[in-house]
From Swiss-Prot:
Class of the enzyme per the UniProt entry, highest EC level: translocase
Reaction catalysis annotation: ATP + H2O + 4 H(+)(in) = ADP + phosphate + 5 H(+)(out)
Sites annotated Required for activity: 362
UniProt EC number: 7.1.2.2
Protein's recorded name: ATP synthase subunit alpha
Subunit and interaction comment: F-type ATPases have 2 components, CF(1) - the catalytic core - and CF(0) - the membrane proton channel. CF(1) has five subunits: alpha(3), beta(3), gamma(1), delta(1), epsilon(1). CF(0) has three main subunits: a(1), b(2) and c(9-12). The alpha and beta chains form an alternating ring which encloses part of the gamma chain. CF(1) is attached to CF(0) by a central stalk formed by the gamma and epsilon chains, while a peripheral stalk is formed by the delta and b chains.
Membrane topology designation: Peripheral membrane protein
Alphabetized UniProt keyword annotations: ATP synthesis, ATP-binding, Cell membrane, CF(1), Hydrogen ion transport, Ion transport, Membrane, Nucleotide-binding, Translocase, Transport
Origin organism lineage: Bacteria, Bacillati, Bacillota, Bacilli, Bacillales
Source organism (scientific name): Bacillus cereus (strain B4264)
Amino acid sequence: MSIRAEEISALIKQQIENYQSEIEVSDVGTVIQVGDGIARAHGLDNVMAGELVEFSNGVMGLAQNLEENNVGIIILGPYTEIREGDEVRRTGRIMQVPVGKELIGRVVNPLGQPVDGLGPINTTNTRPIESPAPGVMDRKSVHEPLQTGIKAIDALVPIGRGQRELIIGDRQTGKTAVALDTIINQKDEDMICIYVAIGQKESTVRNVVETLRKHGALDYTIVVTASASQPAPLLYLAPYAGVTMGEEFMYNGKHVLVVYDDLSKQAAAYRELSLLLRRPPGREAYPGDVFYLHSRLLERAAKLSDAKGGGSLTALPFIETQAGDVSAYIPTNVISITDGQIFLQSDLFFSGVRPAIDAGTSVSRVGGSAQIKAMSKVSGTLRLDLASYRELEAFAQFGSDLDKATQAKLNRGARTVEVLKQGLHKPLRVEKQVIILYALTRGFLDDIPVVDITRFEEEFHAWLDSNATDLLEEIRTTKKLADDDKFAAAINGFKKVFVASE
């Protein structure tokens, strides 16, 4: 067997030509300290603020503090397996969550992973959780109503699509009930709802999901949950994950409602992280950028211009107060960021006025321009009537000699309070709200006993469905008040068959 030198040299040349040198370079650091959901790593010289990093056991982290000789990382998962000396590497990515219509009807955690036991979510679309809010020229003024189905809100503090309306009150005053009723009322409104539960008990979140399912609202709702048992980083990230999922729909021309329940717990989680990262504390031990924490979240709610597709994202943030103190740090911050607030008062709640909305201190700064014409006509004097009733009510307790005008105001006020009461999970279509408020403000209910007002209203709505569908349809389609004669005929027609209690 003869060896030919030319063949060998040709083979060697071919090998050299085909040789590819692939070197994989990754920026790696070493964990020097770990505990309480925080790790400090040496190295990672080129890491970006907010970049995802990966520990050797596969757990992800978020680079937060970029210091001279180490990086402070918040750990997004179990941290008990991470040890001093472990390797941590850059990923080159900032944190993203899955988005898209595949998430609708599902319960997910702030990382977009399903927690409802219904299998994986088949979406490949993702969006970064931190993204700039739409600019001035990309927005349009709020002009379309978002009907909550709650008379006291739609009449007194109307909400428009693209608005940010704060719901504030002590614990156990019905804040979550207001949000759930609003979500349930969006059934035929082509609206996608996102309910973000921050620091809630898992049993509470389960009840919310079951309530939504029972009313058929889970078909257009995404639930994002970071329960009280989960680490602080997930509570901090939950609202951003929720708004990111909503933005995907908004930028595609859809209308979205995002409920944050509640931002007080997110602020507390952020305070915990900041103190563990050794950032200097400020007022109430919150870090200096706690205002920016909420402003950058709520500024992402917008009504987009027609050039951008005309979509909208409406935000309903919740804040829990301590003993009605709205002058604390976080409540005043969020009040100054939002376009109005709905105060829920515990004394009203416990006296049986539910929803316990305080008409005197609740405002909507931009919702008035979104209210339909019919509603603004019938609810025009409602706020003043209620305010003067509350004032007179206090004086009337001291003396019994009241002139007729004062007595009439007290009678009308008592009926107004009764009409604005509403049962749990019983949102009302706007046309029915308009008719009952018309009956109230035009004096048709003045001769109905106060104890019968609630029953009168329930029976009246049932009567309208079978005897005055044309009137309901006219208000629904034109969004304007029908002729006074039509209203009077309908109301008087029902009053003839209504039997007052003895």
